[in-house]
Amino acid sequence: MLSDADLVTFLDQGYLLIDPKTESSLPRQLFEEAADAWAARDQMQGSRFALDALADNLTTRIPALHQLLDAHPVVEALTRILGERYFRYPHNFIHQAGSDDQGFHKDSHFPWSVRGGLRSHRPNWAMLLYYPQDTTEDMGPTQIIPGSQYWNVDHEGHEVGEDLLDLRFNADKVGTNPDLSERDERLAETVHGFDAQTSSMPITVPAGTAVLTHFDLVHRGSRKNSDQERFMYKFWYLRTTEPKHTGRTISLSCKDARREPVVASMAEWLSGNRPSVPNRSKPDTEASDEAERIEQAYQRGLEGDASLTEALLSEDESTRRAAMYGLTVAGGLGAEAAMLATQSNHAGIRKSGAFLLGELAFGDTAVIATLGRLVAEDAMRDVRCTALNALGRIARYQLSQNSAFELSGIIDALTVGSDRDREPDTQGFVVATSPVRQSTAIALLNIVTAAIDAGTARDAIAPIATILQRMATSDTDRYARGTAVEGLCRLALGSEDSVLPTLIEQLSAQYAHTPPARRMDSPVDQRIARD
């Protein structure tokens, strides 16, 4: 298994280099496949197939990818960080370096710049990056800010799904500015403005290297200054089970002491034991930057500092964000504050309250009813997504403790979240997408996995199977549909024997004829980011 030291490196720095130890011919083969995919995309501009050449169906078109994804070092790392029943989300992409610079950002919660909730510090999501060629600094490598996964910038009021460190970067066309020195200066200012004590670094690696990153690590695609092609395969993964506590205390060694309280909390969540963290003297003044706010919030949460409740109810986003994370380790105090927050007239405060309820995972009837009300009634899509994610996390935890945990209230909310009439596709995106229905499908997958592992009675799972069957056969969001299919497969393998034959029959009838390619309103190449 991945060593404790490697795990701490991931929790602290937000990334881990992996040698998959595949056959020596695989990197070259995957490089050629990537080049062919981009050539095919260029020939099919204007058709959805242009997108499909690069995204979401890669393992079917390129079977050799299974050699990478099933490689023991890759599986071992994913298992240690995300648990044994991790799920490869139905989104993947082949990126190509070009002449443009991206701004620093965290990826959107869902594919194609779709926002869908709040970011958990816990390792519930991860990205696997693979470089099939030697990648040098002049080839446009991915740049990252190590340790940035726990810190963020304000985003409320901005529709774009990515959290951009420089909100004006795209509007000011910095990435295409012919004056390269001005680009570099703006990028350097962005990093310094985000945190004066940190810096960015390029991922320069030998051919065949995989990089496992925390989903929320700040990164960007940089321009290339050579004629050599640089491709990167990207895969999304998510956790579907609660951590199995080993009872072993993990020793910490963080490169930045400001991250120690949060890294210690992540290590405790994974192992069950809290590592010792050196006491740092509390500053006399209020925290002036994100890193200090997060550090102090975790310390205050562990101490049960009631002032975090007032901070959670603040309309100042950065103040509220830090309090929200600090309250995840505050137990009952956090739950009381979260319930208050869900009653707010401010959408950001309601969203923070819903998120916090999911992280704390108390299964009280009042908590379930409150989240169900947000799913059914809240006017803000982000709040509904967050409430659905929270319900999935609560059920996942509670079922791990009690196989007979009452699911009816949660199932009622997920039935609402899966309803295409109530939650139609979001307009204006590259493919049909609904963040609410994606959130619903992920919650269902978490619940199904936990219920199977717990040995929950079949009658309790049956309504979930019904929702999954409907989503798997008729949902227009490919990511919700793919996640639902995974849930049904797990049900079938978990002895829910009536599920699989019915699903096969329904899918066979639905896809007896291949649908025609759908034309796009605008060229696909304008929508594709090059990380």
What are these regions (language model features)?
Residues M139-V218:
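Double-stranded beta-helix
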Residues N279-G301, S318-L333, R350-G363, R373, ...:
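Structural detector for internal amphipathic alpha-helices that build alpha-solenoid repeat scaffolds
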Residues R300-L313, G331-Q343, F362-A376, Y397-Q427, ...:
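Amphipathic alpha-helical scaffolding segments comprising HEAT/armadillo-like alpha-solenoid repeats
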Residues R115-E137, T204-V205, Y237:
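Short, conserved beta-strand element in jelly-roll/cupin
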Residues L212, D216-E310, R320:
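Non-heme Fe(II)/2-oxoglutarate
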Residues Q96, I145-V153, W236-E242:
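Short edge-strand/loop segments of extracellular domains
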Residues M1-R119:
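Non-heme Fe(II)-dependent double-stranded beta-helix
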